[in-house]
Amino acid sequence: MDHKRGSFSGKIGFVLSAAGASVGLGNIWRFPYLAAKYGGAIFLLVYIIQAMTFGYTMIIAETSIGRMTGKSPVGAYKSFSDKPALRVGGWINAIIPILIVPYYSVIGGWVIKYLAEYLMGKAHLVAEDGYFSSFISNGVSSELCFLVFTAMTLAIIFAGVENGIERVSKIMMPILVVLSLIIAVYSVTRPGALEGVKYFLVPNLDNFSWMTVVSAMGQMFYSLSIAMGILITFGSYMKKDVPIESSTRNVEVFATAIAIMAGLMIIPAVFAFSGGDPSALKAGPSLMFITIPKVFDSMGFGTVIGIAFFLLVLFAALTSSIALTESAVSTLQDELHWSRKKATSIMGISMVLLGSLSSLGYGPLANVTVIGMQFLDFFDFLTNSVMMPIAAIASCILVSRVIGVDRIADEVTRNGAPFRRRKVFNAMIRFLCPFFAAIILISSIASAFGWISM
């Protein structure tokens, strides 16, 4: 059946929804531990430079493709080319969110569990050694939390673009900003935290390495929602009178600012707690669920800060999972002509089935691995390290070789809107973006198989 395509009410609706997609676990969880691991301020500096060039270019390109066609990734690619090899790029963009959102929802379920424990006054419990591993290995508890998070996401998707996604983003994003400011101020004013602030904000060239560059580029996919089909989909919901460059610049600045705030929330606090112990700063993915509860438990008002922090993370996780799910649902609506209700229901079933593999992968299914990885780790590797760089390369080829930079410029400058960084866009989309995406692809695969160390 045909469906009426939804749309955002205006610029603010697009900016907050797209920023909500970007300000997810990638910024709150992944960015701080990568910054801590790869040199602090030097990582931040490299990331900002890349966000202003690589990130800016890809956001403009994907949003423009979506608005030009009014379609989700598969339909957008088909609108410009009938070559099967290139149209595969559209399908890769469409499949990525279908694979990401199930395991993403599992992590969202973990956040719900921690928030519930803090609300019940169990800050000491979650700070105990072995709590996290005990929780995720308990198949029933982990699965229930995952299902609750999934249900929250689907309920918002059922409501539609303006009444669901946009309305929720307008509520959650301001709260997220306020909470991040409160926690960051509290964190940087702890005794001993200023050394952590210095590590995160004052560049030290001795900490620079090639892996700093590669890791910052990889993080950008998460932080700016690049190559996930989200920006093409959200671009298709953007009204023609909304200026693309200023809107996407706002998204870029907003997402980067929240990533910096996340670093200020976490790195100084961990630095103060550990006395600058490098092993604590480089705890990796366990930073949020193992190290941070210990940090909060050692602080005054630790329970209150824990509630605020995990509420913030829950909002961030929800806004991103909503965007990922919407991208997948939009593709099902466009390509199979399903109603929103049917497309959302089918996507929900897929989320439960695939997500359960990741949820149970540390418990009852712990002995089942794919190329030596647990299900969650495998889906993360497949999407982030393989499919997303390929999707980015496909978008670069589509814009530079098929659509043409001039047509993208015409879309960006519609109604007299400016395109101030057109020269940067031209150079990046033709040469540098595909080159860097290829570097990420090769480096990530080499690291996964142990050929290089990241």
Residue ranges of predicted features:
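Membrane-water interface regions at transmembrane-helix termini and the short interhelical loops
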Residues: 34, 38, 85-100, 148-172, ...
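A generic transmembrane alpha-helix motif of multi-pass inner-membrane proteins
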Residues: 143, 376-399, 420-454
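Transmembrane helix-boundary motif of multi-pass solute transporters/channels
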Residues: 10-50, 232-235, 246-249, 253-256, ...
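Membrane-embedded translocation segments of transport machinery
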Residues: 2-4, 8, 166, 170-318, ...
